[in-house]
Amino acid sequence: MRGINVSTYVSLDGVFEDPAWSAPYWSDAAQQFARDQLWESDALLLGRTTYEAFAASWPTEEWIEREGEFAERMNSLPKYVASTSLEEPLEWNNSHLLKGDVAQDVAKLKEEPGQDMLMYSSVELMHALMEHGLIDEVRIWLHPLILGSGKHLFKDGIEKTELELVDTTTLPNGVVVLAYQIAAR
């Protein structure tokens, strides 16, 4: 069974919203970590907001030229997009709409053979899938920055969930990537 790994940026005070604030922390080490996790995956799982942002960037000549094989991989991987408002056909290459019972659709995807699926941010989708026990690992890129306001990674009222720390990676710029597996229920 393939897993679902979430990768998301967060400030020290728990804010994930509009991660443009993370750009000053990008480094060669961060790029290598991002590359490794992308190559360990054979599909992307995205919510509508993340899909729209990525679809507007990754397929452009500018991004392909700048990001090289990383952009090529982002563009070529199958992308499964959870949305109630988007309509098919989706514009970004190899994108598939999950419009019905998303938890059921994702559970079926997990049963397919292959590598793990990677989910960037897509926090509302992450919350919904966590409620159904479908998220396997959460990789939090903790930035040494306090934003003071914005949407938090874990909303009030979310079900208590036990996590097990399985890996930490400290990048030279002070970002710490914390990898947590969802503990057995």
List the predicted regions and their residue ranges.
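Non-cysteine beta-strand/loop elements that form the S-adenosyl-L-methionine
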Residues: 141
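Portal/gating segments that form or line small-molecule/metal binding sites
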Residues: 1-134, 144-185
